[in-house]
Curated annotation (Swiss-Prot):
Its EC number(s): 2.7.10.1
SMART domains per UniProt: FN3, FU, TyrKc
Subunit text: Probable tetramer of 2 alpha and 2 beta chains linked by disulfide bonds. The alpha chains contribute to the formation of the ligand-binding domain, while the beta chains carry the kinase domain.
UniProt binding sites for ATP: L985, G986, Q987, G988, S989, F990, G991, M992, V993, K1013
Positions of the catalytic residues: D1115 (proton acceptor)
Pfam families: fn3, Furin-like, PK_Tyr_Ser-Thr, Recep_L_domain
Lineage of the species this protein comes from: Eukaryota, Metazoa, Chordata, Craniata, Vertebrata
Family statement: Belongs to the protein kinase superfamily. Tyr protein kinase family. Insulin receptor subfamily.
Spans within the Extracellular topological domain: 747-921
Protein source organism: Mus musculus
Name recorded for this polypeptide: Insulin receptor-related protein
Amino acid sequence: MAVPALWPWGVHLLMSLLSLGSGLDTLEVCPSLDIRSEVTELRRLENCSVVEGHLQILLMFAATGEDFRGLSFPRLTQVTDYLLLFRVYGLESLRDLFPNLTVIRGTRLFLGYALIIFEMPHLRDVGLPSLGAVLRGAVRVEKNQELCHLSTIDWGLLQPAPGTNHIVGNKLGEECADVCPGVLGAAGEPCSRTTFSGRTDYRCWTSSHCQKVCPCPRGMACTAGGDCCHSECLGGCSQPEDPRACVACRHLYFQGVCLRACPPGTYQYESWRCVTAELCAHLREVPGLATTFGIYEGSCLAQCPPGFTRNGSSIFCHKCEGLCPKECKVGTKTIDSVQATQDLVGCTHVEGNLILNLRQGYNLEPELQRNLGLVETITGFLKIKHSFALVTLGFFKNLKLIRGDSMVDGNYTLYVLDNQNLQQLGSWVTAGLTIPVGKIYFAFNPRLCLEHIYQLEEVTGTRGRQSKAEINPRTNGDRAACQTRTLRFVFNLTEEDRILLRWERYEPLEARDLLSFIVYYKESPFQNATEHVGPDACGTQSWNLLDVELPLSRTQEPGVTLAPLKPWTQYAVFVRAITLTTAEDSPHQGAQSPIVYLRTLPAAPTVPQDVISTSNSSSHLLVRWKPPVQRNGNITYYLVLWQRLAEDGDLYINDYCHRGLRLPTSSHDTRFDREDPALEAEPEQGCCPCQHSPPGQALPALEAQEVTFQKKFENFLHHAITIPKAPWKVTSINKNPQRDSERHRREAGLLRLGKNNSDFEIQEDKVPRERAILSGLRHFTEYRIDIHACNHAAHTVGCSAATFVFARTMPHREADGIPGKVAWKAAGKSSVTLHWLEPPDPNGLILKYEIKYRRLGEEATVLCVSRLRYAKVGGVHLALLPPGNYSAKVRATSLAGNGSWTDGVTFYITDLEEEDTGGMRIFLTVTPVGFMLLVTLAALGFFYSRKRNSTLYTSVNPEYFSASHMYVPDEWEVPREQIAIIRELGQGSFGMVYEGLARGLEAGEESTPVALKTVNELASARERVEFLKEASVMKAFKCHHVVRLLGVVSQGQPTLVIMELMTRGDLKSHLRSLRPEAENNPGLPQPALSDMIQMAGEIADGMAYLAAKKFVHRDLAARNCMVSQDFTVKIGDFGMTRDVYETDYYRKGGKGLLPVRWMAPESLKDGIFTTHSDVWSFGVVLWEIVTLAEQPYQGLSNEQVLKFVMDGGVLEELENCPIQLQELMRLCWQHSPRLRPTFVHILDRIQDELRPSFRLCSFYYSPECQRGQASLLPTEAEPDSPPTLNGASDYSAPNGGPGH
């Protein structure tokens, strides 16, 4: 590998070492940084050499590109965890921000990722030229709509396992100009080439920064000159084989030296550096809190590992005997939320008092047990009050002692007051809780039965310490049925969505004590429900309840109807009597039934979910779906119905020789790539089965990881900022947008009532699983497939409604072949008719035919024949053919694409002499008469031409024509006093151009911003007349895409021409300003493909207007197109910018200046300028747009360009150029002028890609253009003229003829 290729990134390495002073000796370590909202927050990175932890830069919505200019942190070389960028507006590249970032270690990852770039709306390239290693973790680059230069990065040079990277949803590669330095003739050596993912290419981060590739053994770093560094260096070094000269260390760093292991007396910290025991003892994970760091097995850890603890003042971790004790000093701690318990995690000994006041919350018990479950001792008191969210105190599962060093009100060690939903005390009784001093107090706990409290008295040894008032039987358990009688259900009836119940009458001792009944019910798939389901009292996982009034008659049995319920669902149900206790000393009594389990009847299922389809052959479709959300029974089978759909007959109406066609594709869903091979159908006879790698077990894991990442990332965003979530989008299986409207009409009706499909039989099948293989289908045909879910009760309740999908089988390879041979028949002088048969069973519809014919010794010509044209004669009529021997072959184009060519057929066109040997005598007789007639016609034509040319506008550059008549003021004259000059805009070919204001120029406007073109004060009278005459040419033009003339000031000096103001200047300057390295870059993104096509359409529209006006431009180039404030491109300046770009012109043989790099070959050879030559120039303008205004034919002198083009040369194809634009250039650069398209034809090809506003203001859609095109079309009766490229006849508008 050539060493010079290292220099582009070697400069960055040298800058990195210089910015770090003496290498690793001056490292400044910063903790994890979360930088958000304000760009100024980035200043926290100012002195950081290493971010020990993660670096997150996110949520800067108000930032602009200007905010990041001049902002750079060259000292930063390492991030030990991960680097995350998310929604930072205005940031276009990281190359200036982190020019020397060398290593991302990935010690801790963001769910497996070390580098995450997510939803960065303005980022154009990653731009980390110094990055040499991502030691652990994958890379995730996703949803960055402007991000390019991803295909030029070899991630294998940075990561040990790049296969898990996730790089999706960024700018399409074909829309990016991913060109590396030195590749397109730029100065210096090109970047190194490597092979990654099976593709060998140049490797770079940006168009000016190569990716560093060291010539050393894999994994070793190197110096800027290519010498190998020490094996412990990572990312680069300043001296070879010196562990003190590394940019970063491969393993460990200590006192400026890179080492494989820490020296004796030091300990590894954060997997990258060594620290002493003293430094480890002073480290703090959270500033301000006591250190918990310990040394374990040669590493300094934030906490001792599980089962180990620090003993006394020692920093070393020792193994615990049993549960590791952890003492937590809390004073008096009030716990009013789960978060308040987090600092008690792992505590076994709480020194102080705990007060629980949990008024609200959901599902608290698991979190409380996780945080408080290890507490064994509370030295003070435990007070639980107003905790309405608590149902049980079982989360204190290890609590053994409440010592009572301090007590509530001086008396109470355990104080439980006003907990409306507390029902159980948990495992305190069985665990043997001890309260050595003080009393216990229970009051206003209406659901806590007294027997639980009395048991606690016995266990804790507090019986007899407290009075009856301190455990009040009237306020504890008064709303719980602590002593109950059993109720029995006497009747039940189940239906699909309801259950009817009746139970026996209940009569308490006092009839007035019975108030009502409450029926509790809930879904219970298993028969394991308990009365106390759900860990809290806030409704989570709790029972549904229904209040039932007492029956009016005492002899009537109470009952209830539970509705609405889900079909075929098991419910747990019990009923409880609500009673009062009126007797003074009697315990609260009640009645309750046992829990019974009832199942509702089945019903029809809901529709199957997520149906997808693919085709693996021309006769098979594979369909897969998911079960219905509500099965409403046991699914026994699925009913699958399918029907062939008729092709859209309207396709025959269009002429696809002149109109583009978006072909439908056979159905394929990438989700099928993960399915099992059992779904694969038998291959077609004569075809080899495709070889697939056996599905590995890693795919489900990767899929699960993907789901987990998305969830975790959304959780992170939820905590970062509240962002409204977009509604779910409904996506269609259909891959063919042209058929959307038709498909929606079909979907509106039922399958069996399809209007256009009644001729095709509906077929059906029953399948037991969520998949089906449909066989015996017609090739490349669309089918509608309906799936119904049927359960075990389908015979009574029916199957589900249908879910459906449209799918198309694959094409048959030979179906579009033309049967038999092509026949021919002479059809008169210089003409022949070719006949052939249509394919009997094509792939869909036959839309057109292509005939490739050639005369012996000449290039082949391709003629396109629409199906309608073919149908008239069963072939095609070729006319105006020169005499000679010909060969021809035909192929058909169907909905699936092109078929195969037929065998060639030969025919001949006879010479006139062969047809009529007596023709020579007639010729000799009439020649003198014909000669005199031709002389007369030539004379008349000469005088007519002189008269016609007096109104023909051709060239507009001063060197192209001579001055004639003096200028006469007319209605375009504007008084000089109405004009005010504001500032200079630049130099034109006649003089300075100014920005100004014109008063009263347009109706309703007080003043109008204008461009003012002037002529030099020293200009001659001839030059002033030329200046005004050139402006007069534009008086006849009125087109939105041609710069408008607004007026002339010819009286007095200086002479002024008033033009429409184009604030963004000429197109060439505008394109060059969009280059990333441009000093005058306005902060706009580089043009996307849609922007390029819009520019091309606007220029073509202006040129089509000029062609319709019989105007030949002769100098079409980006420099002569202007850009308005809203980025509309217009034909303008008409040669007035020539002096500004004088190097674009060349003086040939003492003649005027010529723009040879934009000129057609016929213009260079013979001086012929027509609309066809303007089309050639238009192709060069397209090339300028794609390359951001590079000079055409770079590396060739003007003389060389002249010879190159005249010898048949054209500009080379651009790498990464969009295919659509490359095809347009190829059409424009046909060496035969008649083979080039007209500007209207160009617009025909791209009209569907232009913005809707184009239709409102363009010449192309104007009635004038439509009338002009109609007058140029040949009639159906005319014979076929010699075809141009792609079969389109030459319909170019009449031009002004040759220019000189």
